Amino acid sequence: MKKLLLFVALLGLALPLRAQDDKALAAAAAKADLKLMSFNIRYYKPGADGNNGWVARRAACLEMIRAESPDVIGFQEPHRPQIDYLKVNLPEYAEVDMGRDAATDIEKKPDGGEHLMIMYRRSKYILLDSGFFWISPTPECPSRGWDAMCRRVTVWVQLKDRKTGKEFFYFDTHFDHIGKQARAESARMMVARMKRIAGEKAAVFLSGDLNTTYDNALLDPLKAWMQSARHAAPVTDELPTFNDFGKRSLWIDFIFARNARALAYRTLVDSGRYGVPFLSDHNPVYALYKL
């Protein structure tokens, strides 16, 4: 009886807090210029992941994207069949992508392997420029950097809001999951490249699976030049982003920004509402910004 009363009391406290949180999030959305999402969608491999495989998850992923309606999405890991599926089913978005193994290993990975892909709302933005580079000492060539296990690539776009004329740069990346030196060098290289491409005064955003936690000194170059949405936004959470299909809980997926004000940040963990246990082995995250 005491446990039941305690549960009811805690529930009574939680519901008003949730209502306040939802109200604050709605207020932030009303003020925001853009909504950015980062989503490691988990690579497609026929027969892999059992009930959590891509075919079992893809309709739920579409439903989530349509429900959240982000302006720009940075994807990590999609293979060509996943990209084609998203393009066909989300025609309101244009996309820019690059495979980390493109132009090499053609016989083994004819589709370019894992990609980085940015989708942006056609009706809202004009694409001014775009590009890509490998995260290595030879960024213009297909290459693997330092002690990385895999080739890693970054994709970027420069977008202009059709209505307001405001411009910004958006970079989408994926750091190596094995090489510690590679992750450290990747953070330094990302800052150098963003400065070179976007300059110091432009609004710049970076999203991605960085395969390390925020408190790790490897990310210091990024933290010195940009702000994490989770830390900067007044409406935020502290939920994990890597779920490993229920096996682990880590925060390794990020949205960073420079010269933009974060209004809200969210980790989407309620995949059950879309009819699946997990949308991916990573939880999508999004942030609302004022330019």
Residue ranges and their predicted role:
Residues 17-90, 100-113, 188, 291:
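N-terminal, active-site-proximal structural segment of metallo-dependent hydrolase catalytic domains
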Residues 34-41, 61-86, 119, 157, ...:
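Active-site beta-strand/loop signature of hydrolases that rely on acidic residues for catalysis
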Residues 45-50, 135-146, 173-181:
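Surface-exposed cleft-lining segments at the edges of enzyme active sites
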